[in-house]
């Protein structure tokens, strides 16, 4: 019986400590914060991938525009040379 009373005392002390900790820190909010932190780090990775994809898409679009401008300039110079060489 002595062992059961010591278990009860230690159990109640343990529960009291838990209650005090949860009362001080807001036990449920602490769990929420830790889960939101892990989800925000996941979102950070996902946003990082999206940012990389957007950056690549922007660079491809820019290179395509540069290539189009260069092509138009070359065509213009060829036409200009052909027109002036004929005259």
Curated annotation (Swiss-Prot):
Membrane topology listed for this record: Single-pass membrane protein
Bias (Polar residues): 1-11
UniProt feature, compositional bias: Low complexity: 29-41
GO cellular component assignments: plasma membrane
Predominant localisation class: membrane
Sugar-bearing residue positions: 83
Record localization: Cell membrane
TM segment ranges: 64-80
Keywords assigned: Cell membrane, Developmental protein, Glycoprotein, Membrane, Transmembrane, Transmembrane helix
Similarity section: Belongs to the DVL/RTFL small polypeptides family.
Protein's name in the database: Small polypeptide DEVIL 11
Biological source species: Arabidopsis thaliana
């Amino acid at each position: 019986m002595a062992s059961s009373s010591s278990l009860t005392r230690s159990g109640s002390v343990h529960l009291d400590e838990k209650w005090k900790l949860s009362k001080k820190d807001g036990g449920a909010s602490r769990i929420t914060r830790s889960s939101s932190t892990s989800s925000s780090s996941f979102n950070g990775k996902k946003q990082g991938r999206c940012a990389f994809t957007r950056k690549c898409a922007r660079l491809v679009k820019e290179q395509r525009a540069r290539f189009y401008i260069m092509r138009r300039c070359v065509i213009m110079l060829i036409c200009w040379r052909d027109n002036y060489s004929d005259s």
